[in-house]
Amino acid sequence: DLCVQALNTYAPHGDYPGATVTDIASVKSLPLRQVLESGADASRYVGSHPMAGREKSGPVAARGELFQARPWIICEHEAARTECVKLVRALAVELGAIVTALSASEHDETVALISHVPQAVSSLLATRLQHTPLYALSLAGQGLRDTVRIAGSDPRLWVQIFAANAEPMVRTLYGMRQDLDRLIATLENPTAPGARLDLAQLMSEGNAGVSRIPGKHGTAP
């Protein structure tokens, strides 16, 4: 409810009645709903989400080029003033970001797949390392390190994100569970007729999926 507090503090009758309020939270439907239900001046609120960050937080982790050529999602809503939307867009452009417009629900469905579930998967895999012998961990290559890098993220932040975007995450996780069940069933009987073909199909589907990702941060491959 920080957006509601900001709106009540700055606009329309606070110290800065002409202020535009935005947020950079990782979930957009919940803040928008809170603003609309609060009775605050929703016309000056425009949700946004710069798709940039690191697994570390705080001033020490700051980078001057953090937003350069990164997507910045702006979630316009029916009550938002046009000039407020333009101001938030101008902020993103000034910081070097590439602006994308989505509704709050489109945003949350999208980031569930491209950000929130990857965080969950990385953390789950890293969990398996807790009791792994040190000699085995010393052999870990870049593949494992890349996969679990974001498992070092702040749990306090991600607990809030997961809880706020639970429904879209669950839909994606159910699909992943079906794929995992399929893989497990095949590996439990790897010499069965068609088992190798099924494994190849799973890998091919992964190849097809990763090939659809554009170049880094939305730029040309």
State the predicted function of each range.
Residues 5-60:
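Rossmann-like NAD(P)(H) cofactor-binding subdomain of soluble oxidoreductases
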Residues 135-207:
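Interdomain hinge/lid region at the active-site interface
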Residues 1:
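Short, structured active-site "lid" loops
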Residues 60-66, 160:
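Short, flexible, solvent-exposed loop/turn segments with mixed acidic/basic and small polar residues
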Residues 64-152:
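Internal alpha-helical scaffold of NAD(P)-dependent oxidoreductase catalytic cores
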Residues 200-221:
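Short, amphipathic C-terminal "tail helix"
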